[in-house]
Structure formats: structure tokens, C-alpha cells
Amino acid sequence: MRGMREVEVTPTAAGRFEAVIGGDRFTQFSLLADATHNRFLGRSIWNINAVGLGGVAEMLRGLVATGMGLGIDTRWLVIDGDAGFFAITNRIHNCVRGWPGDGGPLGDAERRHYESVVGANRERLHELVSPGDIVILHDPLTAGMVDMAKETGAPVVWCCHIGVDVANESTQLAWDFLSPYVAQVDAVVFSRAEHVPASLAGTRTVILPPPSTRSR
């Protein structure tokens, strides 16, 4: 495995949005952008996922580029994994969506392997992240990094971009696996309120629909 790496993103100039949203709204946008820039001055926002391609990666590329264009130190890190790790996380991914996938287990052996892969990123994460930064973890592949991210002194947000409106045995299996990792997160983000599991009912939750209709 190559370890955690940073994805290079070209900033998007904020001025390009004026033609899209119009002059008055762009003025409001600029004021909000300036306030946001000042709020995050001297801090970095670290987005972490496990793949550089696909739907979440497409979203991250746009968000990171926009943040950089606003003068906010916005970063994107990708962790690496072996075939066993991706087999386990693909199984979790399917179960969160209510489908058993390959029907394989999510037991102690799978948990040990999952933790060994995400745990290999602890030292590098601690080198990069400073207290006061913000760490945003994306999807089940990075859920196991919550504790090590909090060790840096940074607030940690976990975003789950998948889900299903009606829970079943498969979703229960997935959340039994994931809940111990995300229980201590500072906030969670879901696309729909129906996707929030009962195990996270007391956690600060933000509902943020996907920016693209293709992802809904």
C-alpha cells in the first residue's frame, strides 16, 4: 500500500460564479465568502476519503477547488487499502444501502483487518493536522479514523453519502459495525434524514442533499 496521499486540485476562481447567480446574489456570496475566509484564517480543512475516482471524488474536487478559490486552505487526502480492505468496505457500503451484497460477514476478523488498514494512517495524519483545523471524513471507508483524527485536537465531521429510507437486516449489520467508530464524532452529515440510524440519534446531525441531481 502507498499510504495516505494528497490529491492536487486547481483552485476555482470565485468570480466565475457571478455569471451563474447574478450580480446581487454574487455580492451576497462575496460578503459571505469574505467572512468565511476570515473565520478559517490560519486553519486548514482536511477532506479524507479512500478513492480518487467516483461520485464522492467528483464532489470533493469541486468543493476543494471552490474552497481554495476563496482563499481557504482546503485539502483532500486519499487513504490506501488492500484488496481485503476494499472487499470489507464494499460489503459495508452495500449493507448501508440495504443490500447484502456478497453476503459475507462483518465480524471480528473483518473489524481487525479494517482497523489495521485505517490505523496505518495515524502517524501521517498527526503530522499534517493541527489543533483548530477541521477534519471531514467521507463514507464508511474512513469511519475508523474518527478517534485518531480527534487525537490531533481538530473537530471531526463524518459524512455518509449513502443510505436507504427503510432500515432492514443489512443496514443493521452495517451500523453495528460502524457505530463504535463514529460515536465520538463532533457532527455527522447525511443526505436525507431517513438515512440517519438510531445509533446516531443523539449526535449533532446536518442534512445536506447532494449538490448534483445525478447523486440523489
Say what each PLM segment does:
Residues 1-216:
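Catalytic cores of nucleotide-sugar-dependent glycosyltransferases that transfer UDP/GDP/TDP-activated
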